[in-house]
Each structure stands twice: as structure tokens, then as C-alpha cells.
Amino acid sequence: MKKIFLILIANFFVCSLSNSQNSTSSPYSFYGIGSLNFKGTSENRAMGRISVYNDSIHMNFRNPASYTGKNMFSFNNEGRLVKFTVGLGHSETDLTTSDNSSKATNTSFDYLGLNIPMGKFGMGFGLIPHSSVGYKLQSSNQDNLIQYKYSGNGGLNKAFLGFAFQVNNNISIGFDTRYNFGNIENIA
């Protein structure tokens, strides 16, 4: 019971942090819901953003069928009841115009997930930032009499819950349900 309580508190802490973070400094985040974030894990990125793999030690958000299947087996003869994954990201951006240049550094929460295999079934849930907004733009008219300033911050997050079923040793099927939430603030 204590472990479940600690997991719920950690989940609440990460959710509150992810709702208030700003993980981009891109002027392109001015448009729409902002810059879209990659929806996978560091293993997906390291393999060229592949999303069809399945193994016994990694969680794959991009393929809900991977919540079951090989992840039910043990790795090095140790039983794994659940798979837990969390990721952080760091980026440095150089912004340059004909007049100015600046450097922006961002460190952010990338993902949190838990996968629970249950016989031929599997369940996964977690939290992934969906988009990020973070910009400060300034321009003026030709006479420099009027200055226009635009700024924005925030983003959308995605909470997901997925289920999978292993049809046979080579085929699994799965689906995710997702809920998007967050706040985007644009100031002109």
C-alpha cells in the first residue's frame, strides 16, 4: 500500500511540474499549439525513431501492442513484474537575426510511463508532453514609432492509458486512450 501511495505522489509531482514547464525557445512555437514534441522514449530516438520494436526491458509508447508479448519474459533470469520509464531532455538553441543573437537553454521532463503485463494481457499508462510554446518576438514599423512585442509560454500534455492482448507468440494487438490537457498563454 505504501508503494502505491508513493507512486501516486510521484505521479502528482511530475504532473504538476510538467504543466508549468517551458521546454522550447523556438520562434516557430508562435503558431498553433506550439512545437510538437517527440512522442517516444530515448530508445526510440537512438534507433532512428523506430516504433515497432518490442523487448523485455523497454517500454514503447508509440506501439501499444508492445505492452504485452516479450515483455512478459524475464531478462537474465530475473522476473520483471512491471516496466517503469522516465526521461528528461536538454536542448541548447542559438537564435540569430541580422541585428541580434542569443542563446537559449532548456531542460524539461520528456516522459513518464509504467507497463504492467498480466498473462496474455498488458496495460500501460503514463504522461508525455505533446507540445511546447516558448517565444519572445519583437518588431517595429519602418519609422520605429511603434514596437510590437509578442510572447508565449506553456504547452499541452498527454496522459494515456493503453491495453494489449497477445494473440500468439508473434502477434499482439493494442490500443491507447489519451487525454490532452495544459495551458498555452499568448501575449501581444
Spans of model-derived segments:
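Sec-dependent N-terminal signal peptides
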Residues: 4-13
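Hydrophobic alpha-helical membrane context
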Residues: 14-15, 75
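Sec/Tat signal peptide C-region and signal peptidase I cleavage site
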Residues: 16-20
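Subset of outer-membrane beta-barrel
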Residues: 21-188
